[in-house]
Amino acid sequence: MAARLMKEYKVLQNEEFEDILLYPRDESDLYRWVAIIKGPPDTPYENGKFELDISVPTNYPLQPPTIKFVTKIFHPNIHFKTGEICLDLLKTSWSAIYTLQSVCRSIIALLSLPEADSPLNCDAGNLIRNGDVKGHDSLARMYTRLYGC
């Protein structure tokens, strides 16, 4: 519903967040949003900024938004080519109580706590599952330096 999105937009205009910048791609279309999230501290994504593309369905908040990474990122739960995110919150665990901001916070949390058992990026997932966390973190840091700034 546009009213719900307008309410979220007004809240965002009145508050400033250090780790999330969230705004409509075009103020005349509240169904397309952009988010810039900062990589969480003490992770390979620290100091990176990552752009997300957010498409909001017309029956939002009853249905979740579709969110994809625009910025390339090396993470087991993010598809390397499409930017698709494997996060239950965006699929089966969605509830109308969530906002675009709270979903972005969940994505930041996913960067801190990857789920290697349900990978969209099998290479990243396999590194973690096989105990090569240093290898995973090294590649994730390299991608963050190359693309996340």
From Swiss-Prot:
UniProt-recorded Gene Ontology molecular function terms: ATP binding; ubiquitin conjugating enzyme activity
Substrates-to-products reaction catalysed: S-ubiquitinyl-[E1 ubiquitin-activating enzyme]-L-cysteine + [E2 ubiquitin-conjugating enzyme]-L-cysteine = [E1 ubiquitin-activating enzyme]-L-cysteine + S-ubiquitinyl-[E2 ubiquitin-conjugating enzyme]-L-cysteine
Superkingdom, natural source: Eukaryota
Broad enzyme group: transferase
Matching Pfam families: UQ_con
Name of the protein this chain belongs to: Ubiquitin-conjugating enzyme E2 pex4
Gene Ontology terms: biological process: peroxisome organization; protein import into peroxisome matrix; protein polyubiquitination
SMART domains in alphabetical order: UBCc
Active site per UniProt: 86 (glycyl thioester intermediate)
Protein task: Catalyzes the covalent attachment of ubiquitin to other proteins. Essential for peroxisome biogenesis.
Pathway where this protein functions: Protein modification; protein ubiquitination
Cellular component, GO, one term: nucleus
Gene3D superfamilies associated with the record: Ubiquitin Conjugating Enzyme (3.10.110.10)
Matching InterPro entries: Ub_conjugating_enzyme, UBQ-conjugat_E2_core, UBQ-conjugating_AS, UBQ-conjugating_enzyme/RWD
Family designation: Belongs to the ubiquitin-conjugating enzyme family.
